[in-house]
Structures are given as structure tokens and as C-alpha cells.
Curated annotation (Swiss-Prot):
This is Plakophilin-3. It comes from Bos taurus (Bovine). The modification Phosphotyrosine is found at residue 194. ARM repeats lie at residues 302-345, 348-387, 390-429, 446-484, 488-533, 592-633, 641-680, 685-726. InterPro entries: ARM-like, ARM-type_fold, Armadillo, Plakophilin/d_Catenin.
Length: 793
């Protein structure tokens, strides 16, 4: 037999040891045959041995050796000689090989993973410091060619080709589920003391946390045509590859069809080449729910139906898929839901058609199906159906979908819980549904997801596997959207038992273990920021009365009047505010619970730690600064108490200045708003002026060509300078010394837009206050400024 009839493979074996054995006469059902028939059977056994041997060789790395036959050499010409490290758990668990009892293909390796660390459909954990990259392997063929010189199979990509990608190789990756983006809220109210409610990512801004593409790199020494990408173990941060559940379902049907086809072919038949792509998503063979028995499809049309379904989604349309949802066979229900999920991934017309075909109520009925695989695909399909489609969201709610989702959330299946929390997150982007979602879901979501996965009342460290982390991320994204709704919704969230405690506990634990860049931390801080919005106006009156404490008016000390023999400027009188703060601290609980966290002195330290330690996620630091801005805003006494606490005990000014130097416009809005509140309540404005003035002046524009921050940032900066100038000669002197006058005069005279009109009025007020320092008039004139520059229009 000529070796040229076979193409060797560069695919690695998944099992470290492979044993070979000839098929017995009993297996061939011809034991005891003699003469020419015996010779034919012996030849068949030899052929079977060669074929099995080639399977083994095809799964081992190729080494340099003797010259290959012409056919193999021609097929392997240009192949890369890269070395590949063995990844025992890096490939699909459905590897095909000859069994010892029958001629059908059976798995030869079953990687096992701890159920406590990964869901049955999550990515394989390579290690904490290793990730998969891809190396292009030139023209090497994949898998052994068919017996009797069948032509080589087409190259298989590094993952199964998506239904959306069949039109071209340059299409985008088909991810596990849609990457969820939250809603950006409009501008806040006219009251600029408060931080506007935390804004979410726009639909155009993708989140790198949810979706990871399988990167492909072509070797510069080989042609792209016919090339393959193989995973190679390299050092680096952990990464994930994700395939849509619909495509995984399709792969199961195809694999089962191949196995049954080979069994029907018999020993002398043509063996179908096994073409599968390397995969880092393992499907456990031990769970019968993952590998449905395709024999159940026989009652729906026999082998032709099986062949049509297992060939992929080409022969299925949306009406047929919706009909499959009503079938009694769970396999058909899975296939129908998988097709709907796949078709509605990014097709708005398909979502509309599915709603007209009554797919929504039929999927809702499957949320709590007895078969867990049906539940997963039904919720996965609904997750895509409601994404960016207000009509489908409303249809889901009208079909009692929220109740069914919360029932499904009680199941202890991570894949199902990921889908349910993802659906809730998608629903929460609709302003019309936020109040209803808050009323119906908050308590159960807190009890089932937030409290258990945040570490509240549990172990001292966060212990989440990858699936649980995604579930918690979805839940906090859902809360982030709800918290930007109405006052009633914010109040309901504040009063929900365990909700605020879970968020604070999670952030504290994340800081302790160095996970402050985590996207769930970002969501949690944004929720706290939104719940702090107009806090003193919306908090219970009894709590507000307790926070007001015993001020000077309660002590019977009118402003400016001496206490006993002390003059108005005496040290004793200056210490009264500090004493009052101490009395109020004694009245605040040292162990805050629930909404008490929102105004607790301890929360100031939490936000300060985030500002100091979070270096990469600017949304988290912006939210922390915004939350501090909210609780230090206004004329309430407690706002002043927390401002002085932040300045004097937490020493927050230096971290804020570090952020101001490098912040973008979004961060500057919150940072300067917070500094504005602190400057109004600071005791020592001279010290604050020395640290602040020069850095703030750098942010002001001085000419037409200079880059200018947004108008609200300009107004905040000028307001800070004004707060300092009216109380500190040091601030007035530094404004003159650091060329602040030139910039203020420029801002005052620039009135070419409504925003510049506002900043012009703020600059005019500051210049008028500067002119009150008579001792500086000579210096003003020396710099070329006149009285009209300060007091003129």
C-alpha cells in the first residue's frame, strides 16, 4: 500500500497513551472463514490497522525524518515547523477514535473540570498565568484522509464557522451572547452641586469584559490559503474563547450524525473524515443533558429528518424553529431555540418576525422546562430577542416573563443563571420598565445573587468562579440601570434589605484582594453613586434630623457672638464646629446597615481607597469621585462634616490632585465638582490654596488656540478659586503669580455661546472679588491690568 494515499496530521493526541489492536473476527462477524474470504478479511483487518495507526500518527506532532512520498510532501509543502506544547484540556472532549467493541467512533479522552470552578459550558481554565494564542500552520492538512485515497478534507478554522460568517472569512466573531451595553443618561439637572447620576456605556462603546475574540495571526512564512491556526500555550494574562451556544448545539448534532453514519457504513465502507476544530470549550460527556440522543428524532421523519437537522441551520427557517418549540421532543425544542438565538443575534428583522410568530410566549413557557438544556437555550434565545428591541421586552413582561425568570434563577445551573441575569440587564435599559422591575425583582435578586456572591455575611474573601463572576456582573449591571431611574426606584433600592450591604461588602473585599479594576466593582460603585444622588433631600426625616446634630444654633450661640469671656476670634470658638462634629460621630452607628452606609463616615474611606488604588478603570474612579460629590453637596450640616472628614482624616486632596493632572473631561467633571464642595467646607483655606491654585489654573484656557475643558468643568474650577479667594489672601496672591489673571480675563471676554456665557459670568464674579484686595492693586497695575478688567462688563 502506498503511503502517498494518506495525509498526516499535525493535531496532537488528547490521550497520552493510545493502544492499537486489530479488529477480531468476532467483531467482523466472520470468525472461522477460510480460503479467499479469509484473505479478504485479513486484508480488511490490515487496512483497519493502517487507518487506526494513521489516526494515531495524525494526532502527534510531525518530526523531521525521511523524505515523504510525493503526495504527502506536496500536501505538506510550506508547513510551519513550529513546536506545539501539549494541552491536555485544550481540545474538545468529543475526540473521535476506534473503540474496542464496535466499529463506531467513541471518545478517547474526557477532560474533567471541577464543577465548583466552571460551568459546563465555560472556558477551560488553562492556568492563572497562561493563555491561548494562535500560531499559523501553513499548508499542513488536518486529520487523516478518507480510506482508499479519498481527497483531503478542507482546512478547518480554529473554531466552528458562525452562521453569520459563512459569507466571508472577514466577518466578526460570533460570541457566546451579546455584549451588553448600558444606557447613557441625559445631562443632570441645573443644580451643579450634585454629581449627575452615573452614566452608562453607550451602545457604540463595546465592553471588553464580556466578549473576547479568538485572535488569529498568520505566519509570515506561509500562505494564508489553506492555512490553519493552532492554539499554543504562551505566557500571559488569562483569556477566554467563546462560541455561541447555538453553534455548540449545531456541533453536537453534526458529531452525532457522523458517528451514526460511520456505524452504518460497516468495516468495508468508506470512513468519513473526522473534521473538527481545536476548541477550548469542553462539553462534559458525563452529563447526558449535553449530548442528547439523536435517536429521539426518528419519530419526526426518520433518517432524512436527522440528516437535514444535523447538516446545520441551512434548511431551517424561523417559522419552523418556532414550531419546534412546541414539539414534545426536547432535542427539537433545543434546536428551535438555538436557531432563534442564532438568527436573532444581530438581525432586527428576525427579532420582529419572531415576535409576530409568537416566539416570545412559547420561549417563556420553556424557561422552567424539566430539561435543563431546553431551559438554557430558551433563555439564551430570549436574551438575544430582547436586546435592543423595546417591543420584545414589553412582550416578555406581558407574558409574565419576569416571574418565570425569577423561578429559573433559583436553579443551581450557572449557564441558566447567566442567561436570566443577562435578560434582566437587557430589560432594565428600558425606562418604561425600570419601576416595575424594581418592584418585582429587587428582593429576590438580592437574596439569590447579590448576597451569596458578594461575600456578605460569608467568608472574608471573594470566592467566585468564572460563571459566578459573570452572573454577579450581570446583576450589578441590572442594578446600575435601575438606580438611574426615578426617585421612587432609588428609594426602593436604598430600602431593599441587604442590597447596599452586598455592594459595599463586595467593594471592600475586592480592594482587599487587589481586584478594584473589576467591572463588577465599577457597576457597584456606580450604583452607590446613583443612590447617593440628592441623598439628604430623599432620606427619611428621622435619619436627617439625627444627622443634623447639635449645631451652634442648638447651643444658643448666635453667629459672631462670644462664648463666655472668649472673643469671636478666640481659639475656643473656632473649635466649636469640631466639637459638634465629634458629637455627631458618636450618634452615627459604628456598624452601619443598609442605607446607613450611604452617609456613614466609613464610606468616605472606601471611596478614597478606590481613588488611590484604581489605576486603569477610569469609570470606577469617576463614580467614586461622583459619590463623594453627592454626599458633600448642599448646605446640610452633615455634608460639611463629611467634607472635613475627607480633608482632615482621609487626606483626600493629594489623591484628587493626582487624578486632576491626568483626568479626561468625564473624570474632571466629577473631580472638580467634589473639590468645589470641599473648598466650601474646608477649615484651612490657606493650606488648600497652596496645594490647589496652581494645578487648577493649568486647566483654564488662555487664548483661542488652547484646548478648553467643557463649560461645566470650567465653572467648577472658577467656583473653587472663588471659594478660596473670598477667604484666603494666599489664593489671590497665587492667582496673580501663576498667570491666572490673564486666563480669567480671556474667559470673561469670550461670550460666543450659551456655555461660554455661563463661564464668563463666573469669571466676572471671581475678578470682582480679587479687586477687593487693595494691597494687590499695585501688582495688578504692574501686570498691565486696570480696574475695568476686574469690574467692567
Amino acid at each position: 500500500m502506498q503511503d502517498g494515499n494518506f495525509l498526516l496530521s499535525a493535531l496532537q493526541p488528547e490521550a497520552g497513551v493510545c493502544s492499537l489492536a486489530l479488529p477480531s473476527d468476532l467483531q467482523l462477524d466472520r470468525r472461522g472463514a477460510e480460503g479467499p474470504e479469509a484473505e479478504r478479511l485479513r486484508a480488511a483487518r490490515v487496512q483497519e490497522q493502517v487507518r487506526a495507526r494513521l489516526l494515531q500518527l495524525g494526532q502527534q506532532p510531525r518530526h523531521n525524518g525521511p523524505a515523504e512520498p510525493d503526495g504527502a510532501a506536496e500536501a505538506a509543502r510550506g508547513a510551519s515547523r513550529a513546536q506545539y506544547h501539549t494541552l491536555q484540556a485544550g481540545f474538545s472532549s468529543r475526540s473521535q477514535g476506534l473503540g474496542g467493541e464496535t466499529s463506531t467512533f467513541r471518545p478517547i479522552a474526557k477532560p474533567t473540570y471541577s464543577p465548583a470552578s466552571w460551568s459546563s459550558r465555560s472556558a477551560v481554565d488553562l492556568s492563572s498565568s497562561r493563555r491561548l494564542s494562535s500560531v499559523h500552520n501553513g499548508g499542513g492538512a488536518f486529520g487523516a484522509a478518507g480510506y482508499r485515497g479519498a481527497p483531503p478534507t478542507a482546512p478547518v478554522p480554529a473554531r466552528p464557522v458562525s452562521f453569520h460568517e459563512r459569507g466571508g472569512a472577514g466577518s466578526r466573531a460570533d460570541y457566546d451572547t451579546l455584549s451588553l451595553r448600558s444606557l447613557r443618561l441625559g445631562a443632570g439637572g441645573p443644580d451643579d452641586r450634585y454629581s449627575v447620576v452615573s452614566e452608562q456605556l453607550e451602545p457604540a462603546a463595546t465592553s471588553s469584559y464580556r466578549a473576547f475574540a479568538y485572535e488569529r495571526r498568520a505566519s509570515s512564512s506561509s500562505s494564508r490559503a489553506g492555512g490553519l491556526d493552532w492554539p499554543e500555550a504562551t505566557e500571559g494574562p488569562p483569556s477566554r474563547t467563546i462560541r455561541a451556544p447555538a453553534m455548540r448545539t449545531l456541533q453536537r448534532f453534526q458529531s452525532s450524525h457522523r458517528s451514526r453514519g460511520v456505524a452504518a457504513g460497516g468495516p468495508g465502507g468508506v470512513l468519513e473524515p473526522v473534521t473538527r476544530a481545536p476548541s477550548v470549550r469542553s462539553l462534559s460527556l458525563g452529563d447526558s443533558g449535553h449530548l442528547p440522543d439523536m435517536r429521539g428524532l426518528d419519530s419526526y421523519g426518520g433518517h432524512r429528518t436527522l440528516q437535514r437537522l444535523s447538516s446545520g441551520f441551512d434548511d431551517i427557517d424561523l417559522p419552523s424553529a418556532v414550531k419546534y418549540l412546541m414539539a414534545s421532543d426536547p432535542n427539537l425544542q433545543v434546536l428551535g431555540a438555538a436557531y432563534i438565538q442564532h438568527k436573532c443575534y444581530s438581525d432586527a428583522a428576525a427579532k420582529k418576525q419572531a415576535r409576530s410568530l409568537q416566539a416570545v410566549p412559547r420561549l417563556v413557557k420553556l424557561f422552567n422546562h424539566a430539561n435543563q438544556e431546553v431551559q438554557r437555550h430558551a433563555t439564551g434565545a430570549m436574551r438575544n430577542l430582547v436586546y435592543d428591541n423595546a417591543d420584545n421586552k414589553l412582550a416578555l413582561v406581558e407574558e409574565n416573563g419576569i416571574f418565570e425568570l425569577l423561578r429559573a434563577l433559583r436553579e443551581q445551573d450557572d449557564e441558566l443563571r447567566k442567561n436570566v441575569t443577562g435578560i434582566l440587564w437587557n430589560l432594565s435599559s428600558s425606562d418604561h420598565l425600570k419601576d416595575r422591575l424594581a418592584r418585582d425583582t429587587l428582593e429576590q435578586l438580592t437574596d439569590l445573587v447579590l448576597s451569596p456572591l458578594s461575600g456578605a455575611g460569608g467568608p472574608p474573601l471573594i470566592q467566585q468562579n468564572a460563571s459566578e463572576a459573570e452572573i454577579f456582573y450581570n446583576a450589578t449591571g441590572f442594578l446600575r440601570n435601575l438606580s438611574s431611574a426615578s426617585q421612587a426606584t432609588r428609594q426602593k433600592m436604598r430600602e431593599c434589605h441587604g442590597l447596599v450591604d452586598a455592594l459595599v461588602t463586595y467593594i471592600n473585599h475586592a480592594l482587599d484582594v487587589g481586584k478594584c479594576e473589576d467591572k463588577s466593582v465599577e457597576n457597584a460603585v456606580c450604583v452607590l453613586r446613583n443612590l447617593s444622588y440628592r441623598l439628604y433631600d430623599e432620606m427619611p426625616p428621622s435619619a436627617l434630623q439625627r444627622l443634623e446634630g447639635r449645631g451652634r444654633q442648638d447651643m444658643g450661640v448666635p453667629p459672631g457672638e462670644a462664648v463666655g469671656c472668649f472673643t469671636p476670634q478666640s481659639r475656643r470658638l473656632r473649635e466649636l464646629p469640631l466639637t459638634a462634629d465629634a458629637l455627631t460621630f458618636a450618634e452615627v452607628s459604628k456598624d452601619p446597615k443598609g442605607l446607613e452606609w450611604l452617609w456613614s463616615p466609613q464610606i468616605v474611606g472606601l471611596y478614597n481607597r478606590l481613588l488611590q488604588r484604581c489605576e486603569l478603570n477610569r469609570h470606577t474612579t469617576e463614580a467614586a469621585a461622583g459619590a463623594l460629590q453627592n454626599i458633600t453637596a448642599g448646605d446640610r450640616r452633615w455634608a460639611g462634616v463629611l467634607s472635613r472628614l475627607a480633608l482632615e482624616q482621609e487626606r483626600i486632596l493629594n489623591p484628587l490632585l493626582d487624578r486632576v493632572r491626568t483626568a479626561d473631561h468625564h473624570q474632571l467633571r466629577s473631580l472638580t465638582g467634589l473639590i468645589r464642595n470641599l473648598s466650601r467646607n474646608a477649615r484651612n483655606k490657606d493650606e488648600m490654596s497652596t496645594k490647589l491654585v496652581s494645578h487648577l489654573i493649568e486647566k483654564l484656557p488662555g487664548s483661542v488656540g488652547e484646548k478648553s475643558p467643557p463649560a461645566d468643568v470650567l465653572i467648577n474650577i472658577i467656583a473653587v478659586l472663588n471659594n478660596l479667594v473670598v477667604a484666603s489672601p494666599v489664593a489671590a496672591r497665587d492667582l496673580l503669580y501663576f498667570d491666572g489673571l490673564r486666563k480669567l480675563v480671556f474667559i470673561k471676554k469670550k461670550r460666543d455661546s450659551p456655555d461660554s456665557e455661563k463661564s464668563s459670568r463666573a469669571a466676572s464674579s471671581l475678578l470682582a472679588n480679587l479687586w477687593q484686595y487693595n494691597k494687590l492693586h499695585r501688582d495688578f497695575r504692574a501686570k498691565g491690568y486696570r480696574k475695568e478688567d476686574f469690574l467692567g462688563p
